[in-house]
Regions:
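Phosphate-/nucleic-acid-contacting segments
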Residues: 140-205
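ATP/adenylate-binding site constellation spanning eukaryotic-like Ser/Thr protein kinases
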Residues: 34, 56, 81, 89, ...
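Cyclic nucleotide-binding regulatory domains
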Residues: 17-80
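Short, locally clustered residues in the helix-turn-helix/winged-helix DNA-binding domain
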Residues: 20, 33, 111, 138-142, ...
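Short proline/glycine- and basic residue-enriched helix-capping loop/turn segments at helix->loop/beta transitions
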Residues: 1-15, 71
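Polybasic "coupling" helices that flank or enter modular domains
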Residues: 79-80, 97-168
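Cyclic-nucleotide recognition modules
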Residues: 1, 52-111, 115
Length: 205
């Protein structure tokens, strides 16, 4: 691990600065050390859709590591003062050859992100907002939580709106609708109490 740290260099970004923009060519892996980064894409009409939020320990840039001609398809913007560790393509590839555990972790994360991206695209295209929200809440329930879990939202509601392809006003109304129906309870600190997960999922059908 000391060898990996020796190849990385730290870069600091102020709130609102971009790590990279769509269509920029790059060959680095970015690992968030401090702060927060939002990854988003723009539609042809200029509408922004959130892809994911990166917290300390999360990474991005993995898709450009294996293709020398690849360009970024998304934007990466620091949402607060942020520091990231950057490792160049050649060094990452050497580490992956030597450390199989890192290779498996990277491939696993890439697979999950690809699946999530495909699911997100399909849901925005064909599902209602309430169904998208219900499925989003359900995806944040861990198996060991049972059928009446309390979850912590992984992002602010305005970011959930962007992620689900709708507006903050609409997402607030839908949260209110679910609460009025007795399906959830909105608690403090981004916590949501799901009264009955089965009933919640049935409501979206």
């Amino acid at each position: 691990m000391d060898r990996i740290a020796g190849k990385a260099h730290t870069k600091h970004y102020q709130k609102g600065e971009f790590l990279f923009r769509s269509q920029e060519k790059d060959d680095a892996l970015y690992i968030v050390n401090r702060g927060k980064v939002r990854i988003y894409r723009l539609s042809d009409s200029g509408k922004e859709q959130l892809v994911r939020i990166l917290n300390p320990g999360d990474f991005t840039g993995e898709w450009t590591l294996f293709n020398p001609d690849a360009v970024h398809e998304e934007y990466a913007e620091a949402t607060r003062d942020t520091s990231v560790c950057m490792i160049q393509q050649h060094d990452v590839q050497e580490f992956l050859k030597e450390y199989h555990a890192i290779s498996l972790k990277l491939l696993g994360e890439m697979s999950q992100r690809l699946e999530s991206s495909g699911r997100q695209t399909a849901q925005v295209a064909v599902e209602s907002v309430i169904t998208r929200l219900v499925l989003f809440l359900a995806e944040n329930v861990e198996p060991e939580m049972g059928n009446s879990p309390t979850i912590t939202l992984p992002m602010a509601k305005k970011d959930i709106a962007s992620y689900l392809g709708t507006t903050p006003e609409t997402i607030s109304r839908k949260f209110g609708e679910l609460e009025d129906e007795g399906l959830i309870q909105q608690l403090s600190g981004k916590r949501i109490k799901i009264q009955d997960l089965d009933d919640l999922l049935l409501y979206s059908e």
